[in-house]
Amino acid sequence: MNTQQLAKLRSIVPEMRRVRHIHFVGIGGAGMGGIAEVLANEGYQISGSDLAPNPVTQQLTSLGATIFFNHRPENVRDASVVVVSSAISADNPEIVAAHEARIPVIRRAEMLAELMRFRHGIAIAGTHGKTTTTAMVSSIYAEAGLDPTFVNGGLVKAAGVHARLGHSRYLIAEADESDASFLHLQPMVAIVTNIEADHMDTYHGDFENLKQTFINFLHNLPFYGRAVMCVDDPVIRELLPRVGRQTTTYGFSEDADVRVEDYQQIGSQGHFTLLRQGMPDLHVTLNAPGRHNALNAAAAVAVATEEGIDDDAILRALESFQGTGRRFDFLGEFPLEPVNGKAGTAMLVDDYGHHPTEVDATIKAARAGWPDKKLVMLFQPHRYTRTRDLYDDFANVLTQVDALLMLDVYPAGEAPIPGADSRSLCRTIRNRGKIDPILVSDPAQVATMLAPVLTGNDLILVQGAGNVGKIARYLSEIKLKPQIQEEEQHG
């Protein structure tokens, strides 16, 4: 950003006084790195620490950030403020050193709230669909020439980044309910896609507590703000009378203010009509598969319509939508060795979904777009607590595929829980008699164990939120062909 552009931005968004150097602990996370990228482009000195390099840290380094691949007290020297992710413990040496030096230590959402404070904030919350909906809203606003700032939890593929600094007053951000930190945000517009039981440790196992927290989040809207909510979700429908703000509903339901009708999927595209009260119908071609993505698009259209964005810009953005990283991410179609003398191919798709509802939506999208293909899933459960709490739901959903390979649970720092492991889940699924899951204890053997399952007309879904995405990229690099020596580092 040049001096003239920065001066224009400062006329809209004042700088944070006395803050020059911002240090991020856990800077390699998508949410942390996105905020760091916006602040780097605003001209602040950025440093941060994490355990290993990744694409996020590489991008930040290219912007001039100083990245340490360790956690040491001296890393916070001269910092004006230290930003921490929810994954960082209070005894981290950098946090301890910051407290001793009387440097303010704040959570990621507090910094995001500061970015939003002087902007027209649009926050996207909900158990599922936040990242894709954030990208859709950002794409529509960009297509309309509104040059928004956005901060997303996943890679916005059209932009090639998780976050971007725009020169307008608009800030579009994913709002994270996993640690209730979205309560720091005070947006002008809030989308809530759905509300389900997840991250229940944060809410002390009390679903009513979770629901009330979403209401509290919506009460952060000014009285002239707007809540955009999916009326198909039974919990949202129940909570609507308690919102106390202007509300637009969307969904397939007949009473939705923005209603999805006549949905059909052809390959990776969805085709449907959006009915809007007092506005012309929109005949949408969406470059993303699945009914769940039609709902995400309806939310984005509801916000754009409220802002007065031209319908042609909305339709162009949705038809050209490039998606987000690891959300039904098509990695390629690869030729296979002939099976019974007949050559064939397998499609490879990488998807971040790790909750039963998300996995179910991905399976349905795959079935709708490619009904004749054998659906093979490589699944990695994420967290022992989630596997325990949603065990039966996982067992029900995972039996819908034609073949299942399952990796060990990605612990995300949790200790193992007896009976909430992959071996137990495989046994439960096997006992139901529909499919015979294969437990993959060694990630380095995935390609070898996958090969006999494939028929030459396959769609492989690599599913989960842990390091299974690295395996997906490795399978793409080797074109699904088992290597003589498969290195465990690719797991």
Swiss-Prot record:
Identification of the protein by name: UDP-N-acetylmuramate--L-alanine ligase
HAMAP family, per the entry: MurC (MF_00046)
Subcellular localization, as worded in the UniProt entry: Cytoplasm
Keyword Cell division annotated: yes
The enzyme's E.C. designation: 6.3.2.8
Keywords: ATP-binding, Cell cycle, Cell division, Cell shape, Cell wall biogenesis/degradation, Cytoplasm, Ligase, Nucleotide-binding, Peptidoglycan synthesis
Lineage: Bacteria, Pseudomonadati, Pseudomonadota, Gammaproteobacteria, Enterobacterales
Membership in a protein family: Belongs to the MurCDEF family.
Catalytic reaction annotation: UDP-N-acetyl-alpha-D-muramate + L-alanine + ATP = UDP-N-acetyl-alpha-D-muramoyl-L-alanine + ADP + phosphate + H(+)
Keyword flag Cell division: yes
GO molecular function annotations of the record: ATP binding; UDP-N-acetylmuramate-L-alanine ligase activity
The protein's annotated pathway: Cell wall biogenesis; peptidoglycan biosynthesis
Gene Ontology CC annotation, any one: cytoplasm
